[in-house]
A protein has these predicted regions:
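Structured-RNA-binding interfaces characteristic of tRNA pseudouridine synthases
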Residues: 3-211
Length: 211
């Protein structure tokens, strides 16, 4: 291994690893599958103002049980009000725990609105963002004349009549590869802005339209 390779690929905590030998001894990479109610947080990413975010809540709990500062990397950041059922995150730590201990310990310290569904010690080569092969999003429309008080923060309500066949037909133009640069933020770190939409499924379930 050349000196230039080591300099260019030196270990950065939680960063992308290209050679296992560069991962510090005694360090472990842990992946988590998390679920959260986005209506209780101002998005995923920590913010300078200190307002409640998913990342801040999780890092606080993990820092406590690991007894060292923990920083998370997620597969993809979400905005205020966006929920997740299986968001993947990872972190590096010196702490050694059984996988069930990560679940019980962290969930006992996490605030309401966030839950860790699974935990797994993974290879240092794994990266929650760059190892992701695909992402799945679900949009739910509650299509009735009046809104629901119980589901206000869980679904989108719209009283207008939707034509399912037209929605399916229109969605076909979104399939395939597209350049999403216009939707990228100024600090976007993605390696490319071209992504492929593999499938769009539109179904109804009673008064719900699920996309």
């Amino acid at each position: 291994m050349t000196d230039s390779f080591q300099r260019n690929h030196a270990y950065k905590r939680n960063g992308e690893i290209f050679d296992v030998s560069l991962f510090p001894k005694g360090m472990h990479r842990v992946a988590l599958g998390i679920e959260y109610n986005g209506s209780l947080f101002h998005g995923f990413q920590s913010q300078v103002s200190g307002i409640a975010t998913v990342q801040k809540t999780l890092e606080s709990a993990l820092t406590f049980i690991c007894n060292e500062p923990i920083a998370l990397v997620c597969a993809g950041r979400t905005d205020t009000g966006v929920h997740a059922t299986n968001q993947v995150v990872h972190f590096d730590t010196h702490a050694r725990r059984q996988e069930k201990a990560w679940l019980r310990g962290a969930n006992a310290k996490i605030d309401d609105g966030v839950s860790i569904r699974w935990a797994q010690v993974v290879s240092p080569l794994f990266h929650s963002r760059f190892s992701a092969r695909a992402r799945t999003y679900r949009y739910i429309i509650y299509n009735t004349r009046t809104p629901s008080a119980l589901m206000k923060n869980l679904v989108t309500w719209d009283r207008r009549r939707f034509h399912l066949d037209d929605m399916i037909e229109g969605s076909r133009s979104l399939l395939g590869a597209h350049n999403f640069h216009a939707f990228s933020g100024a600090d976007c770190q993605a390696k490319t802005s071209i992504w492929r939409m593999a499938a769009i499924i539109v179904n109804t379930l009673g008064a719900f339209i699920v996309i």
